[in-house]
Regions:
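Non-catalytic C-terminal accessory region of glycerolipid acyltransferases
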Residues: 16-21, 44, 48, 81-189
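Short acidic/polar alpha-helix capping motifs at helix-coil junctions
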Residues: 2-5, 29-30, 50-51, 89-91
Length: 189
């Protein structure tokens, strides 16, 4: 029986490289399509991941969801004060860090999304300052007949300031631009 999730030869090549190169990487996603599929697929196919997640407000729901996710989603890192430290440690150990990056953050860095100013969570760019590593986006595109296409982006190069340091705002704008491109391409997702 064919899989309900398809991917291109290039996505498979990028994924295999990330899994087999022995280096850490940061993988970002947004709330498009079925955004939990990439974490499930990555772990199922051998990618060592630490995944940032936000706990539900209900403790009972949190316990049930965490039990399910822990079996299938690798190392789970709850959002909070300690999350950046834990994610940085995961990168230093050579793990891949995955996170959703498209939610408004009141004390975030200013980025432009569809011509409007908004605030992005700077954690991804700050982690790059600790451990320079490749950054890729991943998305799931809903297809007809309950099928999906997984796509891994080419590497998103961090923006650097005049001194060669990772530019937090510029890097988050580059990531936001990728997400804007995804929405423009498939606005119904």
């Amino acid at each position: 029986k064919p899989s309900r999730i398809e991917f291109s030869a290039r996505t498979k090549q990028l994924f295999d490289t990330l899994r087999d190169d022995g280096k850490p990487a940061i993988i970002f996603a947004s709330h498009l399509g079925n955004w939990e599929i990439p974490a499930l697929g990555a772990v199922a196919h051998g990618l060592d991941c630490a995944i940032l997640f936000r706990r539900p407000n209900s403790e009972a729901a949190d316990r049930a969801i965490e039990r399910t996710r822990a079996i299938k989603m690798g190392t789970l890192v709850p959002a909070g004060r300690e999350a950046p430290l834990k994610l940085g440690e995961a990168l230093q150990r050579g793990q891949h860090v995955a996170m959703l990056v498209d939610q408004y953050m009141g004390n975030g860095v200013e980025v432009t999304f569809f011509g409007r100013k908004t605030k992005a969570n700077p954690t991804l760019a700050r982690l790059l300052r600790q451990v320079e590593c490749p950054v890729h986006g991943v998305r799931i595109i809903r297809l007809p007949n309950h099928r999906f296409r997984a796509e891994l982006s080419e590497e998103v190069k961090p923006v650097r300031d005049a001194a060669g340091q990772i530019d937090i705002q510029g890097t988050m704008q580059a990531v936001t631009d990728v997400i804007e491109g995804w929405v423009r391409e498939y606005p119904d997702q």
